[in-house]
Every structure is written in structure tokens, then in C-alpha cells.
Amino acid sequence: MTSGRVDRPAVERDWRARGFSCGLWTDPPDQVWADFRHGTDELVMVVDGEIELEVEDQRRRPAPGEEVLIPAGARHTVRNVGGSTAHWLYGYRR
């Protein structure tokens, strides 16, 4: 599940087997979620659209299907940098 169309049920099964929750987030263009920190690891995967993740001052634009781990306690920001609505999966370690 590294590129192309995202099989959400398969991702959810995989994440749950690894101890993570799995939810779907929807962001309009230009939405910014700035400077968050969580007490647990978080996984993020773009379903469609274009987001930029900034984790501890390192920026990246993951492709749809690319999994990104945000370590517990890491400061992070999510931006919808595309011109359309972005959908992305997120999960927290349980």
C-alpha cells in the first residue's frame, strides 16, 4: 500500500493489527492544523488530494498510499496544499 488507490478496509485491518486506530479526515483547500503534539504515535496516509506534513521542522508531501509515522511527542502540522478537498487516514497507537 505504498502508492495508487488506497484500499481503506485493508489499511484499517493492517493498522488495527499493529495496534492503531483508523479514521478518515476531510480537509478543504488551504486548511491548516498547526503545531499539534500527541502523547502517542500517529499514522497518516493520504487517500486523495495533496497535504504537506511538517514534523519537527521536516516537511514532506506524501503520495496517496504512503504511510507516515509521527512519533509520540513530535510537534507536527498538516496543511492541505492542493486546490481541492483532501482526504487522509489517521490513526493513534492504542
Q: Model-derived features: where do they sit?
A:
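Short histidine-centered beta-strand/loop micro-motifs
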Residues: 12-14, 32-38, 79-81
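Structural motif
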Residues: 43, 50-52, 59, 75, ...
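Conserved short histidine dyad/triad with adjacent acidic residue
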Residues: 8, 21-38
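Ligand-binding loop in jelly-roll beta-barrel domains
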Residues: 72-94
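Short acidic-glycine-tyrosine-enriched beta hairpin
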Residues: 57-72
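Short, conserved beta-strand element in jelly-roll/cupin
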Residues: 27, 37-53
